[in-house]
UniProtKB/Swiss-Prot annotation:
<feature type="glycosylation site" description="N-linked (GlcNAc...) asparagine; by host">
    <location>
        <position position="234"/>
    </location>
</feature>
<dbReference type="GO" id="GO:0019062">
    <property type="term" value="P:virion attachment to host cell"/>
</dbReference>
<feature type="glycosylation site" description="N-linked (GlcNAc...) asparagine; by host">
    <location>
        <position position="143"/>
    </location>
</feature>
<feature type="glycosylation site" description="N-linked (GlcNAc...) asparagine; by host">
    <location>
        <position position="353"/>
    </location>
</feature>
<feature type="region of interest" description="V5">
    <location>
        <begin position="448"/>
        <end position="458"/>
    </location>
</feature>
<feature type="glycosylation site" description="N-linked (GlcNAc...) asparagine; by host">
    <location>
        <position position="131"/>
    </location>
</feature>
<feature type="disulfide bond">
    <location>
        <begin position="120"/>
        <end position="205"/>
    </location>
</feature>
<feature type="glycosylation site" description="N-linked (GlcNAc...) asparagine; by host">
    <location>
        <position position="338"/>
    </location>
</feature>
<feature type="glycosylation site" description="N-linked (GlcNAc...) asparagine; by host">
    <location>
        <position position="624"/>
    </location>
</feature>
<feature type="disulfide bond">
    <location>
        <begin position="218"/>
        <end position="247"/>
    </location>
</feature>
<feature type="glycosylation site" description="N-linked (GlcNAc...) asparagine; by host">
    <location>
        <position position="333"/>
    </location>
</feature>
<keyword id="KW-0261">Viral envelope protein</keyword>
<keyword id="KW-0014">AIDS</keyword>
<dbReference type="InterPro" id="IPR036377">
    <property type="entry name" value="Gp120_core_sf"/>
</dbReference>
<dbReference type="GO" id="GO:0016020">
    <property type="term" value="C:membrane"/>
</dbReference>
<keyword id="KW-1039">Host endosome</keyword>
<feature type="region of interest" description="V3">
    <location>
        <begin position="296"/>
        <end position="329"/>
    </location>
</feature>
Length: 843
């Protein structure tokens, strides 16, 4: 009976166990739909920063030209294998008018000019009275008067200067251009240098020349330069053809006004760029699709003489002009120039729907009203009215447009107000050929008699010159750490066993920028390898450039910039690694966390995120919540580390081999003694209890090992001789001798005792649970029946209420109808009553 009862109980218990197991499985299945924050390292994500760029060039250390000298110390060697990686399915916004690269280049070229003039002589001591006369020009006209120098354009001046001895004076003679001197008190012969009213005038070194070389701007490691390859890109707005480069193309920092020289050309049609074409205060940058050659010459064969103006100072001036004195001039092919202007006008008509007319500059400083540039160390200023005056251009039929030039030796510094530079005369004839690749224009805001918008050349702000080359670039900061929701949850905090190797190139890193998040996550290893090796490669080049400056015993401004770029790259990498370490993700490309994803951060579905979005789109989606997510990951990691510390404090079973350590033997001996002592004590307790039990029954113990039969009942005869009977299971007791058998017997008795009581306890618990479940089920059934009963009662009550209301309404309606009928009948019977009354009255 007991066995059957146990079977029935276990059957019920098994049913309920299966029920609970099914519920648990369902709950776990639902739990798998939860999303958890996962950290990814090496994702193709970038943001727009402000950072320090460095330059690269093929400068020649032996060349005294100022750009070569500057680039030798300021720039690293160019990459012989420049790489460019096209980013498919990427659209990026560019803005050439708000580009930090332009400001950096502007400061760099200012630094170049300042550094080039640092070791040269200040000409302030030459601010003396000049007694000047006009140089006699006897040259006959050539082809009219185009090449004949104007009378009075060159002055022959004499003046007194201080010799090596400060108390001694010496009279000197030199030639100056009319633009470099000004009369004193309207005198016809007494002059002074035009620069004497300026604070500082620095003379360029006599062996220095200005011939710009291509300079490449490069991004430090951890940053990238994005390039727009759209051939019709106007410099502002989204660009769909984006690539990434390490450095820009070679940019020649040509300082010029009105015309852009030796720049890059548009690949298809002429491109017109302006911050706001309808605003006449905004300059217009025109980029040609075909260059126009301009050939400039100074035919005068000048000589140079040195004038001592004090101890250790020499002022270089023009001594004499050998041969004919002729004007400096520039030649431009008339047909090609007219065709270019016609195409520019057509572009304005095509894209902005208005016709334009060109005219000469409206006035201002000579640097703005003329096209100024540096040719082999001489500063040329030539009048461009012959280029932009349509009437003059149309009436002239010569093959070339010849523009007369004027030369200045005292030049206002374009980089800052109140400073000037004296350019020493260059000996011999000078010739330089350049390519006109663009224009700087401005709108008058008014129209001519034909209703055309008037465009005039302009210049002065060299940032526009740099914008014409940097319009298609922007610098971005790579953000390799990204977070996204996944279905994987971190279960335990595991210590990283090894670090993941980092190394590759920037282009592999951003190669998956246009891919979906799911596709990009597969290539994380290749992307992450870039970060460290890219840093090492760039820092090696920077270090070589810095080492080249060690003999100077001090770093230049650019040397400091190189150090900044080097340190910045390492700091960026270490910052990312520190962040991963705080999150417990060191050395991992994909790191799960136990932070539950909050749908308020993004309500997009899991499939929509991983199958349809790029990492850039996803980063913009959660940008406002990034700090919150980072904080939650850090808090969760701190909690896990505390849990791990507590767990490790209790964990003494790190390795099975530690069990055999000699340091644990003492513990083993203690445990063995405790077990043996416990068994002996247990044996003593059972023996004492047995003796006490038998003494109470009237027996005296002869020995602890003597078999003492248990008393038999009167209904069970003893099994002696032939008498039968069922032997009692407690009738005999096994006699054991020895320590180990005795120990084993006691241990077996203890286990049997424990098993019986635990079995009874489990049966009691099972019965209790079964009864409780049955009682709960009966209670639920009772509640369900009670609910159904009261539901039926409520339904019947409601129906009865509705019936009563309907009857009352019907009866009331009948009464109202009856009253109305009676009233109607009374009204209808009025004539009858009148007639009956009349009849009675007449009768």
């Amino acid at each position: 009976m007991r066995v059957r009862e146990m079977q029935r109980n276990w059957q019920h218990l098994g049913k309920w166990g299966l029920l609970f197991l099914g519920i648990l499985i369902i709950c776990n299945a639902n739990a798998t739909d939860d999303l958890w924050v996962t950290v990814y390292y090496g994702v193709p994500v970038w943001k727009e920063p402000t950072t320090t760029l460095f330059c690269a060039s093929d400068a020649k250390a032996y060349d005294p030209e100022v750009h070569n000298v500057w680039a030798t110390y300021a720039c690293v060697p160019t990459d012989p294998n420049p790489q460019e990686l096209v980013l498919g399915n990427v659209t990026e916004n560019f803005n050439m008018w708000e580009n930090n690269m332009v400001d950096q280049m502007h400061l760099d070229i200012i630094s170049l000019w300042d550094q080039s003039l640092k070791p040269c002589v200040k000409s302030t001591p030459l601010c003396v009275t000049l007694n000047c006369t006009d140089v006699n020009i006897t040259m006959s006209d050539i082809n009219g008067t185009s090449l004949k120098e104007d009378q009075g354009e060159i002055k022959n001046c004499s003046f007194n200067v201080t010799t090596e001895l400060k108390d001694k004076k010496r009279k000197q003679q030199a030639l100056f251009y009319r633009l470099d001197v000004e009369p004193i008190k309207n005198s016809s012969n007494i002059y002074k240098l035009i620069s004497c009213n300026m604070s500082t005038v620095t003379q360029a070194c006599p062996k220095v020349s200005f011939d710009p070389i291509p300079i490449h701007y490069c991004a430090p490691a951890g940053y990238a330069i994005l390039k727009c390859n759209d051939k019709r890109f106007n410099g502002t707005g989204p660009c769909e053809k984006v690539s990434t480069v390490q450095c820009t193309h070679g940019i020649r920092p040509v300082v010029s006004t009105q015309l852009l020289l030796n720049g890059s050309l548009a690949q298809e049609d002429i491109i017109i760029r302006s911050k706001n074409i309808t605003d006449n205060t905004k300059n217009i940058i025109v980029q040609f699709n075909r260059s126009v050659i301009i050939d400039c010459r100074r035919p005068n064969n000048n000589t140079r003489k040195g004038i001592r103006i004090g101890p250790g100072q020499t002022f270089f001036a023009t001594g004499e002009i050998i041969g004919d004195i002729r004007k400096a001039y520039c030649n431009i092919n008339r047909t090609l120039w007219n065709e270019t202007l016609k195409n520019v006008s057509g572009e304005f008509k095509k894209h902005f729907n208005f016709s334009v007319a060109f005219n000469s500059s409206s006035g201002g400083d000579v640097e703005i009203t003329t096209h100024s540039f540096n040719c082999r160390g001489e500063f040329f200023y030539y009048n461009t009215s012959g280029l932009f005056n349509e009437t003059e251009v149309a009436n002239n039929t010569n093959e070339n447009i010849t523009l007369p030039c004027r030369i200045r030796q005292f030049v206002n510094m374009w980089q800052r107000i109140g400073r000037a530079m004296y350019a020493p005369p260059i000996e011999g004839e000078i010739q330089c050929t350049s390519n006109i690749t663009g224009l700087l224009l401005t709108r008058d805001g008014s129209k001519d008699i034909d209703g055309k918008e008037i465009l005039r050349p302009i210049g002065g702000d060299m940032r526009d010159n740099w914008r014409s080359e940097l319009y298609k670039y922007k610098v971005v900061r790579i953000e390799p750490v990204g977070v996204a929701p996944t279905k994987a949850k971190r279960r335990v905090v595991q210590r990283a066993k090894r670090a993941v190797g980092m190394g590759a190139v920037l282009f592999g890193f951003l190669g998956a920028a246009g891919s979906t998040m799911g596709a990009a996550a597969i290539t994380l290893t290749a992307q992450a390898r870039q970060l460290l090796s890219g840093i090492v490669q760039q820092q090696s080049n920077l270090l070589k450039a810095i080492e080249a400056q060690q003999h100077l015993l001090q770093l230049t401004v650019w040397g400091i910039k190189q150090l900044q770029a080097r340190i910045l790259a390492v700091e960026r990498y270490l910052k990312d690694q520190q962040l991963l370490g705080i999150w417990g993700c060191s050395g991992k490309l994909i790191c799960t966390t136990n932070v539950r994803w909050n749908s308020s951060w993004s309500n997009k579905s899991y499939d929509d995120i991983w199958d349809n979005m790029t990492w850039m789109q996803w980063e913009k989606e959660i940008d406002n919540y990034t700090k919150t997510i980072y904080s939650l990951i850090e808090d969760a990691q701190n909690q896990q580390e505390r849990n791990e510390q507590e767990l490790l404090a209790l964990d003494k079973w790190d390795s099975l081999w530690s069990w055999f350590s000699i340091t644990n033997w003492l513990w083993y001996i203690k445990i063995f003694i405790m077990i043996v002592g416990g068994l002996i004590g247990l044996r003593i307790v059972f023996a004492v209890l047995s003796v006490v039990n038998r003494v109470r029954q009237g027996y005296s113990p002869l020995s602890l090992q003597t078999l003492i039969p248990n008393p038999r009942g009167p209904d069970r005869p003893g099994g002696i001789e032939e008498e039968g009977g069922e032997p009692d299971r407690d009738r005999s007791m096994r006699l054991v001798s020895g320590f180990l058998p005795l120990t084993w017997d006691d241990l077996r008795s203890l286990c049997s005792f424990s098993y019986r009581h635990l079995r009874d306890l489990l049966l009691i618990a099972a019965r209790t649970v079964d009864r409780g479940v049955k009682g709960g089920w009966e209670a639920l059934k009772y509640l369900w029946n009670l609910t159904q009963h009261w539901g039926r009662e409520l339904k019947n009550s409601a129906i009865s209420l509705f019936d009563t209301i309907a009857i009352a309404v019907a009866e009331g309606t009948d009464r109202i109808i009856e009253v109305l009928q009676r009233a109607g009948r009374a009204v209808l019977h009025i004539p009858r009553r009148i007639r009956q009354g009349a009849e009675r009255f007449l009768l």
